[in-house]
């Protein structure tokens, strides 16, 4: 029997609200285990990778890197129609992320003789993690590799868990080829993150690790962030839907089910001003849960779901901003009213014909997004995750002279005499005398 939280938002207890909004990621529960695996990978390299792949993925591998022959076999096994669909999605992803590219170098004169600028430089290397296990995610390969390539990253590798026979799903390998990955490794979980962070005999160390994963992968990313930069915590998937009586109950329910099939820990929430819609969605969710292919996962996930009835649209918006969802769907008559008031959301889907799967696969926006409330402080994966910025100063003698007294006064106030003298020497002062 599926049980979802169903009540008026104003009647929900403090404990119920805290559970929904905090929706604990479980990072603390797995931290010690993750730390142990990471340490082992750092010390023993490939030997540790083989051991953990056998333990967690139940497969013994002779080697981790996907060979060219395996790529060719995979591509021959993917039908031309499916390959074309990959290319359609890839094209949209590429166009959207190209639009995000900043001017490589720019300058401005803030006052005569003082020219300032900024230079954007791509990272040298990036490791993309694509989950496996319950399903293969070629779409995640596109979402992580293509922006890195658009940004100009020189080396992009992919780690994804092997199947029971030691292979990688052909469509995942096809996606890696379409996206432009340099290498693909048959590695998943904590050990994959450790390999990319520290480097092993086989896996090169990277500057940054991006991509979603389960709580173990997320914990691993958080723990290695002083060795290799990461994008953000991206754990179990979630959606919050703001709807009014103009929304279609079957559509809303199908979007809840779609999110629930990702993972038993996925979170799906509807907040609506319509009691009639709320009840209709609840009934529709129960019906659809029985008939979907991944019914058991969906039913488990729905234990984390909620249907909440708000007094006003403003109350719905306020709750959404506190919840800070990974995915936010807006299915109301006046969508701009809601959109303009949203502060915290990873990706926003506006209207009845913009369900989350559109962004998951083919619209072109990125589906690697912060979860568990981290949308309050993080942006979804974008071109800037693959770039770093250097500020530039071009100062003439007259420009420095105009700032001389200000710099000297502030440096001396901070007790940094040599800083002040570095300015004076450019105007005849000899600090050695």
From Swiss-Prot:
Highest taxon, organism lineage? Archaea
Q: Which cofactor does it need?
A: Zn(2+)
Q: In which pathway does it act?
A: Amino-acid biosynthesis; L-histidine biosynthesis; L-histidine from 5-phospho-alpha-D-ribose 1-diphosphate: step 9/9
Ligand binding (Zn(2+)): 259, 262, 360, 419
**GO:BP terms for this protein?**
L-histidine biosynthetic process
Q: What is its EC number?
A: 1.1.1.23
User: Metal-binding: is it a keyword of this entry?
Assistant: yes
| Residues that bind substrate | 237, 259, 262, 327, 360, 414, 419
Annotated Gene Ontology cellular components are:
cytoplasm
Family, according to the entry, reads as follows:
Belongs to the histidinol dehydrogenase family.
Which protein are we looking at? Histidinol dehydrogenase
**Species whose genome carries this gene:** Methanosarcina acetivorans (strain ATCC 35395 / DSM 2834 / JCM 12185 / C2A)
Upper taxonomic lineage: Archaea, Methanobacteriati, Methanobacteriota, Stenosarchaea group, Methanomicrobia
Q: Which gene encodes it?
A: hisD
